[in-house]
Amino acid sequence: MQKQNIVILGSTGSIGKSTLSVIENNPQKYHAFALVGGKNVETMFEQCIKFRPHFAALDDVNAAKILREKLIAHHIPTEVLAGQRAICELAAHPDADQIMASIVGAAGLLPTLSAVKAGKRVLLANKESLVTCGQLFIDAVKNYGAKLLPVDSEHNAIFQSLPPEAQEKIGFCPLSELGVSKIILTGSGGPFRYTPLEQFASITPEQAVAHPNWSMGKKISVDSATMMNKGLEYIEARWLFNASAEEMEVIIHPQSIIHSMVRYVDGSVIAQMGNPDMRTPIAETMAYPHRTFAGVEPLDFFKIKELTFIEPDFNRYPNLKLAIDAFAAGQYATTAMNAANEIAVQAFLDRQISFMDIAKINLKTIEKISPYTIQNIDDVLEIDAQAREIAKTLIRE
């Protein structure tokens, strides 16, 4: 069996590291062909020494120069590239078999689209591709003959709970024809699901990044605390599974053992369960339609005391409601919301605004952008840039 060449867009981040762990557990099946990062020289250097990729690329030109010098000094033959164009070329490299698209934020958009346009098998962990590009992205997957597999634990759970006909028609699955009545998206509710609302004004960045169940980066941890993460996943799920608002349900499940579910018209509910470890969905997408060892502890049913479910409270999670409404408003609104949220979360982490200001800035940014029909990627980038400037101005006020 020939090894699969994997390109990891975002290898220095949380998902990237988990992907390398799966590769390490399956050295006979996978090879880390190219590793891509932002400007984290130290982590990339360590990864190059351990995994010996053909290529390593950093978005930051100066960081790439330092990395190149370090690798030469250690006699590591990995070729170092720099900048967005080089990253996009690696995402479409003819020798690449699978592309793990896990660069966080709008920065991951163009490299992910490059992989799609090269007809690659894309393991999608970058939320923004669908949140900002939606129909454009799904159409590109179809038109260029790419294969899309969802890595996010919730979407991967839904994917696994759907029939094979739906799995083969991502973005265009006729849910009702396949007997599906609802897609049930579960979320932990974050660290503040029981915190009294009057205490929200004094929530600190340290409290917000301490997620009870999952190990994640700071941005996604704050998004989990505001449930914007679930809002973005709602938008993604609607595009991935071609689901209407009526076919969607969002439930808070504090234990994060059930990762999402699918209701069928005959009364069945199929759920995917497992320990909260991203290596499971990563391994599932890498091996699909087969299975491979992920290095994850098996689920011990005797240790699970209970599984509980709570209806989401939009007073507690205004960002979740905002995301649902933004999808209904159109692509311009989800793009603006996503951009504003990136700026607002960073401002909160930098202690420039309060926890409750995040949702307010997101809403005000959408309200200041004129409704607009997005035709192409340039429109997306234009609205993204506009929204960021508006959000920055609101923060300064």
UniProtKB/Swiss-Prot annotation:
| Residues annotated to bind 1-deoxy-D-xylulose 5-phosphate | K127, S153, E154, S188, H211, S224, N229, K230, E233
Pathway field: Isoprenoid biosynthesis; isopentenyl diphosphate biosynthesis via DXP pathway; isopentenyl diphosphate from 1-deoxy-D-xylulose 5-phosphate: step 1/6
For this protein, what is any one GO molecular function term? NADPH binding
Cofactor(s) needed for function: Mg(2+); Mn(2+)
Tell whether Manganese is among the UniProt keywords. yes
Q: Does the keyword Zinc-finger apply?
A: no
Q: Pfam families annotated for this entry?
A: DXP_redisom_C, DXP_reductoisom, DXPR_C
Return the protein name: 1-deoxy-D-xylulose 5-phosphate reductoisomerase
Which source organism does the UniProt entry give?
Answer: Haemophilus influenzae (strain PittGG)
Gene encoding this chain? Answer: dxr
